[in-house]
């Protein structure tokens, strides 16, 4: 049986433009870009830990990362203005290259 997936809101502040581009490119392989430094990702526990490890290799001590797990009720209460609001229960899988 496949591991259960959960929605995560991931936001970051990267001080160096070169590191920012590397982190941004990595996250594009895991989820959907919502705003400048904000992604939403549907991840298994294993995917989440792998992503955190990969991000730690690209980030510096002055950079910050926030990974917010969203329960089903939280996802239902997400409201957006002039942005996509659809958070499907079973999101399309992303292929990590």
UniProtKB/Swiss-Prot annotation:
Record's keyword annotation contains Thylakoid: no
GO biological process: defense response to virus; maintenance of CRISPR repeat elements
UniProt superkingdom: Bacteria
Cofactor(s) for this UniProt protein: Mg(2+)
SUPFAM superfamilies cross-referenced by the UniProt entry: TTP0101/SSO1404-like
InterPro entries registered for this protein in UniProt: CRISPR_associated_Cas2, Virulence_VapD/CRISPR_Cas2
UniProt keyword list: Antiviral defense, Endonuclease, Hydrolase, Magnesium, Metal-binding, Nuclease
Any one Gene Ontology molecular-function term assigned to this protein's record: RNA endonuclease activity
Cross-referenced Pfam families: CRISPR_Cas2
Enzyme class: hydrolase
Residues that bind Mg(2+): 13
Cysteine pairings via disulfide bonds: none
Keyword Hydrolase part of the UniProt annotation: yes
EC number, UniProt record: 3.1.-.-
Regulation: induction: Part of an operon going from at least MXAN_7266 to MXAN_7259 that includes a CRISPR operon with transcription continuing into the pre-crRNA locus.
Gene3D superfamilies in alphabetical order: 3.30.70.240
Entry similarity comment: Belongs to the CRISPR-associated endoribonuclease Cas2 protein family.
Subunit structure: Homodimer, forms a heterotetramer with a Cas1 homodimer.
Function comment: CRISPR (clustered regularly interspaced short palindromic repeat), is an adaptive immune system that provides protection against mobile genetic elements (viruses, transposable elements and conjugative plasmids). CRISPR clusters contain sequences complementary to antecedent mobile elements and target invading nucleic acids. CRISPR clusters are transcribed and processed into CRISPR RNA (crRNA). Functions as a ssRNA-specific endoribonuclease. Involved in the integration of spacer DNA into the CRISPR cassette.
Protein name (Swiss-Prot/TrEMBL): CRISPR-associated endoribonuclease Cas2
UniProt organism field: Myxococcus xanthus (strain DK1622)
């Amino acid at each position: 049986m496949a591991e259960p997936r959960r929605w995560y809101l991931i936001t970051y502040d990267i001080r160096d433009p070169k590191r920012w581009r590397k982190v941004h490119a990595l996250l594009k392989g895991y989820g959907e870009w919502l705003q400048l430094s904000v992604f939403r990702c549907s991840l298994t526990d294993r995917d989440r830990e792998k992503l955190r490890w990969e991000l730690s290799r690209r980030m510096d001590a002055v950079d910050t990362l926030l990974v917010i797990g969203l329960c089903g009720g939280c996802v239902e209460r997400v409201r957006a203005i002039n942005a996509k609001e659809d958070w499907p229960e079973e999101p399309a899988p992303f292929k990590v290259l």
